[in-house]
UniProtKB/Swiss-Prot annotation:
Bilayer-crossing regions: none
A molecular function (GO) term: nucleic acid binding
Source taxon at top rank: Bacteria
Organism for this UniProt entry: Mycobacterium avium (strain 104)
Pfam families: UPF0102
Family: Belongs to the UPF0102 family.
Identification of the protein by name: UPF0102 protein MAV_3752
Length: 128
């Protein structure tokens, strides 16, 4: 039984890492520069912190990787509680920075890996 749990956990970890890598590629193609990946503090983790140097905007990105819609779509995956947590984490990260930003944005990127294994990326900007 333990081997099954470990195998499932590793699969989820690998799936999450793949989703984050695809999200980074997507953000880079949009012209954003990634500042941090998996920034952690005692209150949680921010998947990706990126910036748009042209507009001096910092973007905090939550990545949701799914193999199907069994848990609902992307909007259902980001609850008001999750948005509050992301805001708190963003504030903590900003408090430790010397740079001042003209704008701050929280985005969610959904990566859906279907049976064909061709990932579909959905990017919701400014969710909170």
């Amino acid at each position: 039984m333990a081997a099954m749990t470990t195998e499932t956990t590793m699969t989820r970890i690998q799936l999450g890492a793949m989703g984050e890598a695809l999200a980074v590629d997507h953000l880079t193609r949009m012209g954003l520069r990634v500042l941090h990946r998996n920034w952690r503090c005692r209150y949680g983790e921010l998947d990706i912190i990126a910036c748009d140097d042209a507009t001096s905007t910092v973007v905090f990105v939550e990545v949701k990787t799914r193999t199907g819609d069994g848990y609902g779509g992307l909007p259902q995956a980001v609850t008001p509680r999750k948005v509050r947590r992301l805001r708190r984490l963003a504030g903590l990260w900003l408090a430790g920075q010397d740079r001042r930003w003209a704008a701050i944005r929280i985005d969610v990127i959904g990566v859906r890996v279907g049976r064909r294994r061709t990932p579909e990326i959905t990017h919701l900007q400014g969710i909170g």
